[in-house]
């Protein structure tokens, strides 16, 4: 490991066009799951000026009002006036949803639910590190917290000239793998025409950055780039088109761990792209919480229609406190990583997904894959005190 190095991660707000798309896709999934938890859902969304298109493959007994779900989601994000470049009440909503292919269905559905096959082939990674209290890398954790703070002060009226679209980026300094400070902070936020650049920069510093970033990591050397172009009035879907599944690094570990390439939002848990990535995080987090390693990355792989993973890999980057063999044996013994098993283990057949679609899927204790309920078992198994 390099003695001293910098590492950077970024996040985007709930009003970023790609995140609008993710939230609509997951809002549709949740609405269907409220009526039919066994539904098959693959919902993709595209947003651009004045228009939302919702498509994909859905097989369900439920009936949901796609148009109203779409408008309500955009409304909650805060795009409610044409002055912002997008209006939930007047945008067009196009629905192009079809049904899941019976060829896929026959590989997934089995007479014995425990033998449910994976919905596709693929590789998934999960990661945990003890550098933050939520066992996530610090750069992505604090990038998300900046975006959550931006939304909070926008919605509660503290900074009424803020608009929904925003991005953050935080560069941490490490020395021998330990955080020693924050080198740079980038925060760009959409705003109304009424605020000057100087006033915006001061307000963002005082109301967003300072309340979020720990003072001990900031110094006179820390660099701040607040709306560095000087103007960000045109934003949201008017500035860029948005698509479901285009923020997969923001959704996961900010680049600090590997990624299998599969996106999450709009997919029911039969899609291992989503459910197995959650399970891999759960496994990695419990290994770190148990004190078996300081850092842990899990890779899983699957074949379409086959229940058992085709491979399980554990990487602890030389930080393990017990042998790799013990860790791998513990994973096999205490975690059921078949599609049905991990759905049951993590209680995934419930409408909890819209909340995941902004500010990251990991490091947020309200989600079942963030539980560390297996840590004591693992500690005992490994003989750790």
Swiss-Prot record:
Matching CDD domains: S-AdoMet_synt
UniProt catalytic activity: L-methionine + ATP + H2O = S-adenosyl-L-methionine + phosphate + diphosphate
Assigned keywords, A-Z: ATP-binding, Cytoplasm, Magnesium, Metal-binding, Nucleotide-binding, One-carbon metabolism, Potassium, Transferase
Function: Catalyzes the formation of S-adenosylmethionine (AdoMet) from methionine and ATP. The overall synthetic reaction is composed of two sequential steps, AdoMet formation and the subsequent tripolyphosphate hydrolysis which occurs prior to release of AdoMet from the enzyme.
A single MF term (Gene Ontology): ATP binding
Compartments reported by the entry: Cytoplasm
Assembly behavior: Homotetramer; dimer of dimers.
Paired cysteines (S-S): none
UniProt key word Chloroplast: no
EC number(s) on file: 2.5.1.6
Binding site residues for Mg(2+): 18
Binding of ATP, residues: 16, 165-167, 231-232, 240, 246-247, 263, 267
Amino-acid positions noted as binding K(+) in the UniProt annotation, renumbered to this chain: 44
Family statement: Belongs to the AdoMet synthase family.
Pfam family, one: S-AdoMet_synt_M
Pathway named in the protein's UniProt entry: Amino-acid biosynthesis; S-adenosyl-L-methionine biosynthesis; S-adenosyl-L-methionine from L-methionine: step 1/1
Name listed for the protein in its UniProt record: S-adenosylmethionine synthase
Co-factor requirement: Mg(2+); K(+)
Ranges for region Flexible loop: 100-110
Cofactor note: Binds 2 divalent ions per subunit. Binds 1 potassium ion per subunit.
GO process annotations (BP): one-carbon metabolic process; S-adenosylmethionine biosynthetic process
């Amino acid at each position: 490991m390099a003695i001293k190095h910098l590492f950077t991660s970024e996040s985007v707000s709930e009003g970023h066009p790609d995140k609008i798309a993710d939230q609509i896709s997951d809002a549709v999934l949740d609405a269907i799951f409220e009526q039919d938890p066994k539904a098959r859902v693959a919902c993709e969304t595209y947003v651009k000026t004045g228009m939302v298109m919702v498509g994909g493959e859905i097989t369900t007994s439920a009936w949901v009002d796609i148009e109203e779900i779409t408008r309500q989601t955009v409304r909650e994000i805060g795009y409610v006036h044409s002055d912002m470049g997008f209006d939930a009440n007047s945008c067009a909503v196009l629905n192009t949803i079809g049904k899941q292919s019976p060829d896929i269905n026959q590989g997934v559905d089995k007479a014995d639910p425990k033998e449910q096959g994976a919905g596709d082939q693929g590789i998934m990674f999960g990661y945990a590190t003890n550098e933050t209290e939520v066992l996530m890398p610090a750069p992505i954790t604090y990038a998300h917290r900046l975006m959550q703070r931006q939304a909070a002060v926008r919605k509660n009226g503290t900074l009424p000239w803020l608009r929904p679209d925003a991005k953050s980026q935080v560069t941490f300094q490490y020395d021998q793998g330990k955080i020693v400070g924050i080198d740079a902070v980038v925060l760009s936020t959409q705003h109304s025409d009424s605020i000057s650049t100087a006033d915006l920069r001061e307000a963002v510093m005082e109301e967003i950055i300072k309340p979020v970033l720990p003072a001990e990591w900031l110094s006179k050397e820390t660099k701040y780039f607040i709306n560095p172009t000087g103007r960000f009035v045109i934003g949201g879907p008017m500035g860029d088109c948005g698509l479901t599944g285009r923020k997969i690094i923001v959704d996961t570990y900010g680049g600090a761990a590997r990624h299998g390439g599969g996106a999450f939002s709009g997919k029911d848990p039969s899609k291992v792209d989503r459910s197995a990535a959650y399970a891999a995080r759960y496994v990695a987090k419990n290994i770190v919480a148990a004190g078996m390693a300081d850092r842990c990355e899990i890779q899983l792989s699957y074949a379409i229609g086959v229940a058992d993973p085709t491979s399980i890999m554990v990487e602890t980057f030389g930080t393990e406190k017990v042998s790799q063999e013990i860790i791998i044996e513990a994973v096999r013994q205490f975690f059921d990583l078949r599609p049905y098993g991990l759905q049951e283990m993590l209680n995934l057949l419930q409408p909890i997904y819209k909340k995941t679609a902004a500010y990251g899927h990991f490091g947020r204790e309200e989600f079942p894959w963030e539980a560390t309920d297996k840590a004591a078992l693992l500690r005992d198994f490994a003989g750790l005190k």
